[in-house]
């Protein structure tokens, strides 16, 4: 980045010695550099060539890692955090943003159910859960938030958001009336969905999803087939999860007519 930025800086000097304002906004590089690290590195390169440049570095994100930082920075929000259930069932501390003026929470799914939070044998979408995401939403509601922006990139999960909804009071029950197990494997036992104990404040809430893909829930372009391998799924797991998610989607649509597994981005 410093080398490329130096070249850019040199070109700017040649074109116009008075051009001193530079805005840098670079998305993060998974597993290597955050958005701000990349931006500051580029800024260092520019400064080496054009010492008088006025440089503004801003975080940028696509719905995955860095989304909270980018939006909180741009919306004059503040950061808070809460301990929740991580993707493998162990506690994790999830930071999220709050914009008090609009009662809006900005949440990264990757902060509570992220692929970087699992390793080795824990990297298995049959077992990983989104329960912690629901716990973050619940905490934000208790902090007065009624509007939510949720970035869904970078997750370690493939449970169709069931864990998240369980944390918010939805019942996903097996044939014996018990909550199904965490992870995609729990969907194999799903028989019914109940709403008797749903958090009542959810009726007052709005949700917007930050996402840069258009995959449907199931099929050759669905979440299991496209994103399952990077989450640790084998070819057998992919077929199983796709089948279970299709049944889950059909069951959900019976109760919630607007639920559409083919909606772009549902996967």
Please describe what each predicted stretch is.
Residues 1-16:
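Single conserved hydrophobic/aromatic residue that forms the stacking wall/gate
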Residues 18-152, 156-267:
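N-terminal loops that bind phosphate or other acidic moieties
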